[in-house]
Amino acid sequence: MSRGDLILTPTGLWHEHGHDGQDPVVWLDVLDLPLVYYMEASYHINGQRQDVVQGRGDRQYTRSGVVPSHVFERSRKAYPLLRYAWTDARAALESLAADDPALEHVQVTYTNPETGGDAENILGFYALMLRPGQTLRLPARSPAQVFHVIDGHVEATLVDSTFNMVEADTCCAPG
């Protein structure tokens, strides 16, 4: 896991949270904790750390439009890729911006490489790049939106409130 990566922890798949480095880390969890706490459905099990096995999907899905197929069969995994590298998303954004300089919204969607659908079946994840000095008015949407700054800085105005955000800042726009 590296800075800016999107890590999926889908419902029903065992996973652990940890940090082996010495420097501080920001972990932004985007989930339904208020509902889970209200229903008293949250629990955890203290156990041994799992062994990290390299090559469990990260490298199999590194080329756009090309997915592994073993003897003409496709994977039926709901979540074949759990880590989406920020370096790949940033490269895609920069390529998109260079390819179409007039493009107002430089945005990519994190998708399931097997199905083409959203990376997570209950949440949509996007990366949006603003050019220096750009002002962008996003359309109103019914669902709430969470914005997290990975690089640079941005001034976000939501209704009558303005937020000056820098790297690692997060804000939410209610639906």
Where are each of the predicted segments found?
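Active-site lining segments that contact anionic ligands and/or coordinate catalytic metals
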Residues: H105, E120-F125, G133, P143-A144, ...
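Short histidine-centered beta-strand/loop micro-motifs
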Residues: G18-H19, A119-E120, T135-R141
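Short, glycine-/Ser/Thr-/acidic-enriched flexible segments
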Residues: W14, D32, T115, P143, ...
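A short, N-terminal "cap"/entry segment at the start of jelly-roll beta-barrel domains
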Residues: I45-I122, Y126
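Conserved metal-binding segment of the jelly-roll/cupin
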Residues: M1-D20, W27, L158, N164-G175
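Short, flexible loop/turn elements at secondary-structure junctions
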Residues: T11-L13, G21, L31-P34, M129-Q134, ...
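A short hydrophobic beta-strand segment most commonly corresponding to one strand
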Residues: L8, Q22-Y43, F147
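Glycine- and acidic-residue-biased ligand/ion/polar-headgroup-sensing regions
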Residues: M1-S2, L130-Q134, L138-S161
